[in-house]
């Protein structure tokens, strides 16, 4: 079974490095990777600067071969764990 790497998408400046690491891992293991964004009710209150950084990180993940997924919920940790459980990430 091929590896399936999951990486969170965020507006954090460090997220680009994390996305690149996930892409490298997926390539090294001959697998795929998914970039997951958990959209919370706070999304609308995000600054335009943070929304733009999130768009840039999403574009980077797509360019590196990620499948982009978005889920909705209040509890980011729960949503990530539930997505991982249901989608079979390794």
Enumerate the predicted regions with their spans.
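Small/aliphatic-rich secondary-structure junction motif
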Residues: 2-63, 69
